[in-house]
Amino acid sequence: MANSDKEFIVAVELGSSKISGIAGKKKDGTMQILAYAEEKTVGCVKRGVVYNIEKTYQSVNNIIAKLEAVLKTKISRAYVGLGGQSVRSYKCVIKRNLLTQSYITNEAIDAIRQESYEIPFNDYEVLENFPQEYVVDSSIIADPVGVMGTNIEGEFLDVIAKSNLRTNIETVFANAGVAIAEGLISPLQLANNVLTDAEKRSGCALVDLGADTTTLVVYKNNIVRYLVTIPLGCSNINKDLATLPIDDAETEDVKLKYGDACQDTDMSEEADPQFYTTSDGRQIDRKSVV
């Protein structure tokens, strides 16, 4: 293993159905993907949150080992996604009286924003903070620096999560001997990769349906306006299918092959197949699945 891991960028995502790791290298201004590995998260991650540290550590350790085998170097640091049921947004307003009319400085704005980070939440921490708008003496201003005023009010969107979300992940990676380069909020990283600046500017919502959770992120004027995580995902469909005479292990296969969200699905007798045959020979009417 002669190469240095500083040449590569490694990221790990801890999802409810799988833990995945990817390694790449910047080349000519683009990211070249060099290695990918994943492990099923059986009994260790629930609704995006690590609840069995030992099993999660074993999966992360296996993924790191697979990536190292391809890269031919030891991985000492990785970027890690932060997600899960507790991740959501919270709006807060910070007000300051400047006592006398004066120019608003960068330092004053930074102090107000820092105060929004420090608002106490029971068992929660602020992961990120997004300024929404400022009000200077009753006038709404996008950038108040340099404006004269006596009173300033800042509205911020705090993205918060339960404190154990980060601490459990930190414990897992410490056990694996891998430093966390940065914890990145997964829904926002996804949005940065799939949404254009024009879409964020004009206003849009991004919905990501995962195994145990669904996240919704709303943008307007290139600013994050809302984020919520709903405890509902694709696994709920599997649970519904499990009420049919289908083995739990086959529900995912049935869902992918025959599931359809459209009501105009062809259910005529000419449609093929009309039945799903289970591994033990039982037949399930396709109408029960769609």
Predicted regions and their residues:
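Glycine-rich phosphate-binding loop of actin/hexokinase-like ATP-binding domains
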Residues: 202-243
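Nucleotide/phosphate-binding catalytic cleft detector across ATP-hydrolyzing
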Residues: 1-18, 22-205, 223-225, 234, ...
